[in-house]
Amino acid sequence: VAPQKSSFSIEPGFWSLNFHKSKKFDIKYFGKPHLDIFEKAIQNIFKISQRKFNLDRIAMIGDSLHTDVLGGLASGISTVLVTNHGLFKNHDYQKEILRTQIYPDWIIPSI
């Protein structure tokens, strides 16, 4: 489920969770906040740069605590929450951070 301007929309993750609960399907999640997508991105960064470096030099920049920030934190990279765009535009991001206990490394209004 994803927040919209005045309601919520049902997203693919909702349907896959229902399939998983039915035990009729074996579900493999690939996408934020699951580690596979972050590990793949980190591998690509190392491949393109032709060297490895500390993960704290890589940052996940996004507008969602539950996908962008949570996934970045779980994968060991820095996280940057953008607040004047996307999910938190015109919303109290500080209240949501306290409610969820998901703390980004950095908070910026825009890129």
Predicted regions and their residues:
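Asp-based, Mg2+/Mn2+-dependent phosphohydrolase catalytic module
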Residues: 1-111
